[in-house]
Design a protein with these regions (language model features):
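Short, surface-exposed coil-to-beta transition loops
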Residues: 6-8, 63-67, 90-95
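A conserved amphipathic terminal alpha-helix motif
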Residues: 1, 113-161
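A broadly conserved sequence feature marking short terminus-proximal activation segments
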Residues: 172-254
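A short, structured loop/turn motif at beta-sheet edges
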Residues: 14-17, 46-47, 71-76, 98-107
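Beta-strand/loop substructures that line and gate deep hydrophobic ligand-binding cavities in soluble
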Residues: 82-136
């Protein structure tokens, strides 16, 4: 008989819910930190306009395949992620995050539950399955105060990435060349630290405007130092054509003139056109000769993958649910 095994972690934080949400709801960073494998997704459009996402990965001796279900969420409050396995030692894997505001800050509860598909699955769940999340979540809790006050840029502690042989000298020379230009703006070292010390999930697409917000510097300075870093060979760059619905990059090119004039988003099952003012983005990544970055994802459906989606609920035909959410004043698309 397959019995679900689960574990719940609970903490009290002095930080407001939105800060804790930013850390705990980032499933890309979390999965990478616990040693989960990257995976590829095959998106299968259905006749009713919906899409079934089938993910495939390998972990140790196991070939894994599962259906990546829609992640229900209410921004800054809770999410529920479901995986239904078609191949591997597990039948199901679920995770929940619930954040409740308190007088001092908030309370967060994080639950992981899994159902084995056989004897090997039962053995895995009975031994080391929860040790990775336990280590990472306890680190997160310990680092939350420093993350909330801006002392550290990320609450996740991960081993430094493996760089190509001779990379340290190469990085040093390239930083000197950038600093000799009028476009470094004193940001060269911070950019190098970000590109060559942060998680793969953070550097596969380095967005200058996001760096500007993170570092509290003018957007133009962040853009110029990234462009200069690409010119010198510290970074690479790619132009992306973004889906107007999920905002994921569905078409890309190393040069703007080769970017497609239109694209189809398999995730959303829609066609869309290129609009330079609305859905064309320039993103950077570490130079592949120095730090090759895995292009597959650690999580394709988490809340922080589509942070502009503030409420997402999946319903069965005829089902109704009442959802409570705190939304900022503005326009929303239903």
């Amino acid at each position: 008989m397959s019995t679900e095994k689960s574990r719940t972690w609970s903490w009290e934080f002095d930080s407001p819910p939105k800060v804790v949400w930013t850390a705990l709801a980032n499933t890309q960073r979390f999965n990478e930190a616990i040693g989960a494998p990257t995976y590829k997704v095959e998106e299968l459009p259905q006749s009713d306009g919906s899409v079934i996402s089938i993910a495939r990965a390998r972990k140790g001796p196991f070939d894994l395949e599962w259906e990546e279900a829609v992640v229900d969420r209410v921004f800054n409050r809770w999410f529920h992620q479901r995986r239904i396995f078609l191949k591997g030692p597990l039948k199901t894997l679920n995770s929940w995050l619930k954040i409740t505001q308190t007088e001092k800050g908030c309370r967060a509860e994080f639950t992981i539950a899994a159902t084995p598909s056989g004897m090997m699955g039962r053995l895995i769940l009975a031994t080391r399955f929860f040790s990775g999340p336990d280590r990472v979540l306890n680190q997160l809790a310990a680092n939350m105060k420093s993350f909330a006050d801006g002392t550290v840029e990320t609450p996740y502690e991960v081993p430094p990435p493996t760089l190509a042989l001779g990379s340290e000298a190469r990085i040093r020379d390239l930083k000197e060349a950038i600093d000799q230009s009028p476009f470094s703006h004193g940001l060269t070292q911070r950019l190098a630290d970000f590109a060559f010390k942060r998680q793969d999930a953070d550097v596969s697409q380095i967005r200058p405007l996001a760096l500007a917000r993170l570092w509290n510097v003018p957007a133009r300075h962040a853009v110029e130092v990234c462009l200069q870093a690409a010119k010198q060979g510290l970074l690479g760059l790619r132009w992306h054509l973004l889906c107007p619905h999920c905002q994921g990059g569905k078409g890309e090119s190393a040069s703007l003139d080769q970017l497609p004039v239109g694209e189809h988003c398999n995730s959303c099952n829609i066609d869309f056109d290129r609009e330079y003012s609305g859905n064309v983005e320039l993103a950077f990544h570490p130079a592949a000769a120095i730090r090759p970055v895995e292009t597959a994802a650690f999580c394709t459906a988490g809340p922080m993958v589509t942070p502009h989606v503030v409420v997402q609920i999946s319903l069965k035909p005829g089902e109704t649910r009442t959802v409570t959410a705190e939304l900022a004043h503005g326009s929303y698309r239903l």
